[in-house]
Amino acid sequence: MEIILATETWQMAGAWYVRIQAMAKKHHITLDREFDALDGPDMRYILALDGDFPVGTARLYPLPDGESMMIGRVVVLPEYRHKGLGTAIMAACEAWIRDLGCRTAVLESRDNKTEFYAGMGYRITGDAFIDGDTFRCIRMEKRL
């Protein structure tokens, strides 16, 4: 298993493939809702590969405060879950955030995944909200 910073078109396509397979198809999310204006050529993606096959991803983008980065769309294909890959993807995100000079990682967790992130040191910093009429989410943060 390898985790990389997606910088080439094929790598970004791999990140999108994982999101389509694990989120859009499973949860019946239309592509125009899964892929928003942030998913452009300047988006930063982490990609987990099993050989050449994409199996997990996350995206990162800076927040207006200049000190924080949002981690979003953290997804692992179902057959690769519960093997530490999500934790490894998050560690890669946090390392990249530090390398970019930011001090806080922010995410909006689905309410049934907050324990996963709390186990990595994230704390709840906001009230629950509905994201895209699909998921109940909660904002969480971690100082790096």
What kind of region is each of these model predictions?
Residues 19, 117, 122:
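Conserved active-site tyrosine of GNAT-family acetyltransferases
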Residues 1-34, 39-40, 45-53:
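Short amphipathic alpha-helix that is part of the acyltransferase structural core
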Residues 108, 123-139:
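Conserved catalytic-core motifs of GNAT/GCN5-like acyltransferases
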Residues 76, 82-95:
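Conserved acetyl-CoA-binding loop-helix of GNAT-fold acetyltransferases
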Residues 47, 53-62, 68-75:
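Conserved beta-strand in the GNAT
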Residues 90, 97-110:
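Conserved GNAT acetyl-CoA-binding A-motif
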Residues 62-72, 81, 131-137:
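A conserved beta-turn-beta hairpin within the catalytic core of GNAT-like acetyltransferases
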